[in-house]
Amino acid sequence: KFLLKTETTTVLVDCGLFQGYKWLRERNWQTLPLDIDKLDAVLLTHAHLDHSGYIPVLYERGFRGPVFTHHATKALCQILLADSGHIQEEDAKYYSKHKLGKHAHPEPLYDRQTAEASMRLFQSVEFDEQIEVGDIRFYLQPAGHILGAASIIVEAEGKRIGFSGDVGRFDDVLMKPPRPFPELDLLLM
């Protein structure tokens, strides 16, 4: 998650779940250090849950702004986020039934219904389509990682910032290669 703020606009670039070790997963339950009411938009690089999986939590906590992403990423998120919610529900039932863990009544971080509802926020963007959110302009360019994966180029306050997302290989037989970045003031990888 990268938080980008100007004087008038706040966007979050990627909004993923922590995965892997338990101490990392527990961070998903912590409150984000941002005011959701002041968040104008989410810019999403691709569908993998470590980049998109926290969007239903934002939705559940009241975020109703747009989630801008490539149309293929939107289609993949429709499947992945609903499945993530379902798996979390099933895990909570299993932990409860077998009295595992430290909680008397384990709860999922979010459920399938919330994940499906959060999809209403998604707005499809084509590669190279210029989008404005407040005083921030951005566009997506192909990253070659998975279908719809994008790097995001943001222009704000006279600076150009690149967010790589996950970048694929130049010699992949199935994916188009990632596009080289334009001249940037800052690249976040």
Segments and roles (model prediction):
Residues 3-4, 123, 128-189:
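Metal-dependent phosphodiesterase/nuclease catalytic metal-binding core
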Residues 6-65, 69-120, 167-179:
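Pre-active-site segment of Zn-dependent metallo-hydrolases
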